[in-house]
From Swiss-Prot:
GO terms for biological process: gluconeogenesis; glycolytic process. Keywords: ATP-binding, Cytoplasm, Glycolysis, Kinase, Nucleotide-binding, Transferase. Pathway: Carbohydrate degradation; glycolysis; pyruvate from D-glyceraldehyde 3-phosphate: step 2/5. This is Phosphoglycerate kinase. It is found in: Cytoplasm. Belongs to the phosphoglycerate kinase family. GO terms for molecular function: ADP binding; ATP binding; phosphoglycerate kinase activity. Signal peptide: none annotated. PANTHER family: PHOSPHOGLYCERATE KINASE, PHOSPHOGLYCERATE KINASE 1, CHLOROPLASTIC-RELATED. It catalyses: (2R)-3-phosphoglycerate + ATP = (2R)-3-phospho-glyceroyl phosphate + ADP. The gene is pgk. One of its GO terms (cellular component) is cytosol. The keyword Kinase applies.
Length: 398
């Protein structure tokens, strides 16, 4: 990576500003999935082991008005992080002001402080999300000229807590997580060991147009599953029953199929039900067509076999988006089948591009079998699309 990393700077005795991604799910104030906190530990531990004073910034959820702050404090995260680090984490509970400044100035080498949810600054004019210049300068002033960005999950956004701070420090560098994310995903797409197979699922073609176009150029095969299958079907005149379809994207789907040179591989059957919820009948279709009054909610057994065959011998696989409504046991066979087909390939470099795919791998017990599971859904999608990420572009060149 042509950007400076946390290993390229002297941290001893320095107040080091760190953007992490602690946007974790909370239920009644309890963290239900701590993966993002765990993923940030190597960078935080390295900073404090080097004698730095780590000042952490993160958002949590969306905050637009005062009422939205309810249940969005990072206090539970501070407690969880303290337990994981085995040391106190200072949590002043504010995003600016004398209370924060005094707590930072009182830090000693090897200590950690967590600033309150950066999006609390969005209540008064979206200062965080709109990369307010004054806020970026203020947060940058709290440190000693070093900023570490380790939040891949927000690298596709230009916010005050990443791009804003970067613009106002002497050195803006990548943390270990950001470095790994970029290395795995960018290398997989730009310099893959071949055969390179991409698998794209999810419900909407509109979300993946740019990704499909980019991967059709880079990959040897692009397998399509999930709800967007039926937009591709309808574009070819195949009956789809009551399945999800984006009527305004039929021409786009047709165009992608025509210019794919056979690289785009669609399912050949579906698991259909007579309703999305409260269904009384679930069955496999004979072929591509979905029955009248039914909707496709997963790829079928013939498609699983076809995708298994398409993945045989693959050396690089990038997967983004489940094959069906995997949260429901009746419609998770396709996602499980594809996961198992990926991980059984000898010597394969297998990458999950965040979001629902990551949740599927974790929930269905396959996470440890993949080479890399991205922590950022939107950011990984934009990398797969070949876009430049603002949070990465803002870092200091080597």
């Amino acid at each position: 990576m042509a950007k400076l990393t946390v290993k390229d700077v002297d941290l001893k005795g320095k107040k080091v500003l760190v953007r992490v991604d602690f946007n974790v799910p909370l239920k009644d104030g309890v963290i239900t999935n701590d993966n993002r906190i765990t993923a940030a530990l190597p960078t935080i531990k390295y900073i404090i082991e080097q004698g730095g004073r780590a000042i952490l910034f993160s958002h949590l959820g969306r905050v637009k008005e005062e009422a939205d702050k309810e249940g969005k404090s990072l206090a539970p995260v501070a407690a969880d992080l303290a337990a994981k680090l085995g040391q106190d984490v200072v949590f002043p509970g504010v995003t600016r002001g004398s209370k924060l400044e005094e707590a930072i100035n009182a830090l000693e080498d090897g200590q950690v402080l967590l600033v309150e949810n950066t999006r609390f600054e969005d209540v008064d004019g979206k200062k965080e999300s709109k990369n307010d210049e004054e806020l970026g300068k203020y947060w940058a002033s709290l440190g000693d000229g070093i900023f570490v960005n380790d939040a891949f999950g927000t690298a596709h956004r230009a916010h005050a807590s990443n791009v804003g701070i970067s613009a106002n420090v002497e050195k803006a560098v990548a943390g270990f997580l950001l470095e790994n994310e970029i290395a795995y995903i960018q290398e997989a797409v730009e310099t893959p060991e071949r055969p390179f197979v991409a698998i794209l699922g999810g419900s909407k073609v509109s979300d993946k147009i740019g990704v499909i176009e980019n991967l059709l150029e880079k990959a040897d095969k692009v397998l399509i599953g999930g709800g967007m299958t039926y937009t591709f079907y309808k574009a070819q005149g195949i009956e789809i029953g009551n399945s999800l379809v984006e009527e305004d994207k039929l021409d786009v789907a047709k165009d992608l199929l025509e210019k794919s040179n056979g690289k785009l591989i669609l399912p050949v059957d579906s698991k259909e039900a007579n309703a999305f919820a409260g269904y009384t009948e679930v069955r496999d279709t004979e072929g591509e067509a979905v029955s009248e009054g039914f909707l496709g909610l997963d790829i079928g057994p013939k498609s699983i076999a076809k995708f298994d065959e398409a993945l045989t011998g693959a050396k690089t696989v990038v997967w983004n988006g489940p094959m069906g409504v995997f949260e429901n046991p009746d419609f998770q066979a396709g996602t499980i089948g594809v996961m198992d087909a990926i991980v059984k390939q000898p010597g394969v470099k297998s990458i999950i591009g965040g979001g629902d795919s990551a949740a599927a791998a974790i929930n269905l017990g396959r996470a440890d079998k993949f080479s890399w599971i991205s922590t950022g859904g939107g950011a990984s999608m934009e990398l797969l699309e070949g876009k430049v990420l603002p949070g990465l572009a803002a870092l200091t060149e080597k």
